Amino acid sequence: MTRARPMLALFGIPLAVAAAGSVQAAGDFMFGALGAAQSAAARKRVPLASSLEEFQDYNRAYALTGGGETEIAADRFAAAYPHSELTVYLYSKAMHEYRKENNSARALAMAEKVLRLDADDPAALVLSATVLADRMSESDLDREYAAERIRRRCKHALEIVDTAFAASANATAEEIAADKATLRTMAYSALGIMELKIGDFAGAERDLHVAAEGSRTRPDARILYHLSLAEDRLQKYTDALANVNRAMLAAGNDGNVRKAAAEERRRLEDLARGASVQH
């Protein structure tokens, strides 16, 4: 599903923009269906280009592909038109381009730029929370600060997704519902991974279970693996083993998840064998 760019207005006259430059992270569940979603600000009214030159420069910038090229174009556009209402769309596209390239650091940087322009952008909220949760480690000195940022962003995204997500005009009701469901799944996944890393295993199990249910039609190995870890810490070994097996099946060609899930499965199987010997 390819998303069209928003309808723009030049000097207050709406101008339809072709979908040729629209973006889609094809094949990537954790952002595949969303593409470059419109910001909440654009949902409220048609964004305006103040001149024909601005409108044409925006079109040229949006037609580029690749995270690096799109980011450079967005920076140049922002410098040339510091008050433009269109800049957020270029940074949003750069964010999704970097996501397609698995460049989480630059995707996060672009998400932060989007949020500075539109604090109610659900996709930027959940993508940034996802990257922040993935980055957390036990040695972080600012773990509590990072955890609170993730909580705030996920909570806000979940609060506004029904009203702030604006799909393209040709999106079907089913596509819009699927996009919103993906955002919710991402938010609960980020919350659960963060909670797992700070030792809130019950909270992690709760939120990762919601995320797993949200991705049931297309099981996500990463979510299932972290859910199994939370259940392991809660000594729910039967559930943990079932979910790590599901993670193995869903991992496909993702070698990192397969390796981690295989190690967790061996640990759980060893525990099960030890328990049977004791009995």
PLM regions with names:
Residues 23-89, 276:
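N-terminal leader/linker segments that initiate helical-solenoid repeat arrays
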Residues 43-46, 78-88, 116-123, 139, ...:
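Flexible helix-coil transition and linker loops at the boundaries of alpha-helical arrays
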Residues 51-54, 88, 122, 129, ...:
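Start-of-helix signal in alpha-solenoid helical-repeat scaffolds, especially tetratricopeptide repeats
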Residues 59, 93, 127, 183-186, ...:
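"A position-specific structural signal for the A-helix of alpha-solenoid helical repeats
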Residues 70-73, 107, 150, 204, ...:
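Single-residue signature of alpha-solenoid repeat helices
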Residues 101-106, 132-145, 181-197, 232-243, ...:
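Alpha-helical linker/edge segments of TPR/alpha-solenoid repeat scaffolds
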Residues 145-162, 232-256, 262, 266:
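TPR/TPR-like (Sel1-like) alpha-helical repeat modules
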